[in-house]
Amino acid sequence: MTVPLHLGVRAHDFGQIPLADLTRKLQQYEFSHIQFAIKKSFPQSASSLSALSPGTATYYGNAFRRAGIQIAVLGCYVNIVAPDPQTEAQALADFKTHLRLARDFGASLVGTETGSVGQGYTTDNFTEEAFQRVIAAVSKMVAEAERFGVTVGIEAGLNHPLHTAPLARRLLDAIPSNNLQIILDCANLMSPDNYLRQDEVVDEAFELLGNRIAVIHLKDFIVQDGKIQMVPVGQGWLKFEPILRYMKYERPHIQGIMESTTEPHLAESVAFLKQVYENV
């Protein structure tokens, strides 16, 4: 019997719509799980991330549970290496709040990228100093996760201090805790310099990160004017065959989360992924 493809989506890719409409749409597209960032989907319920209460978490967690939808990733995408110490401290506090409330949301993994040591893009992100700041911040996050029995999911991001699979492996080796896992987004590993070698880049990620990959983001890209641009799944240049083959045979039942594919393109993108998955 073929292992089914477990597909989900970022809730905020539907925009800011009423909760009942969101759950109805998720059921309509037969998504079994979501990545949920409350500030992006329901900002009125999160005046500040650190002010979230168990009641807020339970309210949304119960609503998704009743609809048969699991929160696979509780999104708290904050800048954990912000240039301003006060901003960095607030980012870590917000993330720790999500770790504390994860179980009330019905989630076990809280996810983020690493951010930027400058305002926006800077080559300073590619320094050893920036990477050491990532280790310092993630160490604090993982210590808190261990207290609450939940997991930190770190995602490599284009032009972030953590932007390659080898750096993600270094992070895992530097923080020897199973409460630290990787959210793998193969599109985020692409750059104008390496996308023509994407088979090699993706194979390296699977080899280096292996069973420390908790969730896989499914996103597509093109290169335009020398820069990576994200496009709906199936409309770009990412080769999904090796990714879906890995999901089907190496990590059966691992959850995939579609990203940067808005509703006008969802049906076509879902059909594309299911077709590729069936054929690999």
Annotate each language-model stretch with its function:
Residues 37-59, 117-120:
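Glycine-rich, proline-tolerant flexible connector loops at the mouths of alpha/beta enzymes
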Residues 20-21, 58-59, 63-66, 81-182:
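Active-site acidic/histidine proton-transfer and metal-coordination neighborhood
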Residues 15-26, 90-99, 198-206:
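Short, acidic/polar
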Residues 20-40, 106:
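Catalytic domains of carbohydrate-active enzymes, especially glycoside hydrolases
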Residues 266-280:
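C-terminal helical cap(s) of enzyme catalytic domains, especially alpha/beta-barrels
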Residues 4-9, 34, 40, 139-237:
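Acidic/histidine-rich catalytic cores of soluble enzymes
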Residues 233-236, 243-257:
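H/E-rich (His + Asp/Glu) clusters that bind or coordinate divalent metals
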